Amino acid sequence: MTNAGDREKTQPVPDSGCTKSDVEHLFGKCILRFQAFELLMKAILAQHRVSGSDAQPKDTLTRQVDDTQRKTMGLLVGDMMTSFLVPEGQQGQSDETVELSGCSFTFLQQIVLPPDEFARIEAEHRDLVALRNSLVHHFLEERDLRSEAGCHGARQALVVALDRVSRAYNDLSGLALEFAAASKAVA
């Protein structure tokens, strides 16, 4: 014979819907995915364009990496879309002017895209910056997490956000592989 306590342990719990805890978990996943995306951008951008004196090339690269690490996602996207990913016809161009005395070097690696693909990627990345900023700075202002319906709406928005940043991360990973292959070919 079983008592009521045993029955409660073995019977399935009815779906209680979306909770604030579910939303918090998904929010954390979104933020972590955005950080992974940002770190991948930093890894690419820190080394795609390097200029300096050939007397101290390691110092130049260290400085470039340090400068890149301090940039926000918005600045990184701006850098990526003006110097790493470029539309056909603008390859080899760089806004950066380096004035050095003596022997110097400049290394610039770019991925050239058809104009329509460049425009699509640029719009997607600008939208990602806006989405990330909205999540980080306004999520609680825009969502009511005190009700099940509010949590459900927040969860749906986070699922869409996670899907978008995951697709962007996967696309950027593909570009990073192209970058690594080109770097290896040059070395």
Predicted regions span which residues?
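Helix-loop segments that flank and shape redox-cofactor active sites
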Residues: 14-21, 43-60
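Short, hydrophobic, well-ordered secondary-structure elements
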Residues: 26-49
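Charged alpha-helical initiation segments
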Residues: 1-28
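A structural signal for well-ordered alpha-helices, especially hydrophobic packing surfaces
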Residues: 38-41, 45, 129-132, 136-139, ...
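Hydrophobic packing residues in well-ordered alpha-helices of helical domains and bundles
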Residues: 23, 30, 121, 125-128, ...
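Secondary-structure edge/capping motif, primarily at the C-terminal ends of alpha-helices
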Residues: 44, 48-51, 139-146, 172, ...
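Amphipathic, Lys/Arg-enriched alpha-helical patches that create a basic surface
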Residues: 152-187
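Flexible secondary-structure boundary motifs
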Residues: 53-123, 130, 134-143
